Amino acid sequence: MIVLVVNSGSSSIKYQLLDMDNEKVLCKGLAERIGIPGSRIVHKKDGEKFVIEHPMANHDEALQLVLQTLKDEKMGAIKDFKEIDAVGHRVVHGGEKFSGSVLIDDEVINAIEEFSYLAPLHNPPNLMGIKAIMKLLPGVPNVAVFDTAFHAKMPKKAYLYAIPYEYYEKYKIRRYGFHGTSHRYVSRRTAEILGLDYNKSKIITVHLGNGASIAAVMNGKSVDTSMGFTPLEGLVMGTRSGDLDPSIVTFLIEKEGLSPEEVYTILNKKSGVLGLTSNFSSDMRDIEDKALENDPLCRLVLDIYEYRIAKYIGAYVAAMNGVDAISFTAGVGENSPITREEICENYLSYLGIKIDKEKNNVKGEERIISTPDSKVKVLIVPTNEELMIARDTKEIIEKGIKKLEY
């Protein structure tokens, strides 16, 4: 089965074409700067990179060009669009309605539109991609895989905020969590690597990219996660503040004469690592480099970053009453030996964790980095959200079902 995976953003579209008989990536790419000057597709096949400079006024035009690229004699991997058996779409927010991946129909499209108020920057462009593909590939089934779905069945004690209950009833204000597809892939893969029964395991997944979140996965289910109503809650991130006292918002509005929208922008785009370093960088690689050169501010920022992560890990050990394994993933999680080592050695030794420094001193390679006698196993597991989306798509189509429950 050939599955096309589409991740449609506001001005870019990531795509992968996979042969799901062997889970091989046939080709992949990124259509970027959609609707603005300088639009292009960066396409990769068999390790070779192609750059296609071409105007793309909207998502329809971008995906039309992507499809043409997929069947191009030199760059493509198919000869006819009929070879594409199904399309899997990343959708950021599924609200409370979707706790698993679903076959897309009019009802699903309406629901994604309905939840756009919860993810105004993400759901509308996700929908543009879905509608464009349905127009360009009529008759090909489409599947939606939601970032929030893995966390949708968290217990109420984990997802409700201690605010008047009527706001949950009226507006569905609750903790939703994000990066669900990544947490699901990494936790499953962790169990496979260690030979654990996924449905009888306690795994903490640590997704550290520019956006970052942690999940407690108990017996194959997400029971808690650090992001909340929006992706702003939780860890210190590249440009996001993570947890903070809500009264800071009203304080800044009053003292700085800012609008609520301006404060929201500050907390989302100008805070986190970027804000703490006075706009030096939002990239943890830059912070680490400076910290290793004994820059006091960057050393402090690295400490704050690691401390917040360690606190959440400790909280989730308590939430699950134990832990079998901790897995690091995404840009920082996969590629920062110093962050992994310092979190584990400075804060988690009470769990009986011991890190093998030689095994830890790698980047982006799947492996166990704890010692054989470590009471809790620690791993690097590179995430693969596209493969997870393709697997869900294949399962729904092959089984002829409308919904896949996790």
UniProtKB/Swiss-Prot annotation:
Alphabetical list of InterPro entries matching this protein: Ac/propionate_kinase, Aliphatic_acid_kin_short-chain, Aliphatic_acid_kinase_CS, ATPase_NBD
Binding site residues for substrate: 90
Subcellular location: Cytoplasm
Pfam families cross-referenced by the UniProt entry: Acetate_kinase
Alphabetical list of SUPFAM superfamilies matching this protein: Actin-like ATPase domain
Biological or metabolic pathway of the protein: Metabolic intermediate biosynthesis; acetyl-CoA biosynthesis; acetyl-CoA from acetate: step 1/2
Marked site (Transition state stabilizer) residue numbers: 179, 240
Binding site for Mg(2+): 7, 385
Molecular-function annotations in GO: acetate kinase activity; ATP binding; magnesium ion binding
Record-given protein name: Acetate kinase
Gene: ackA
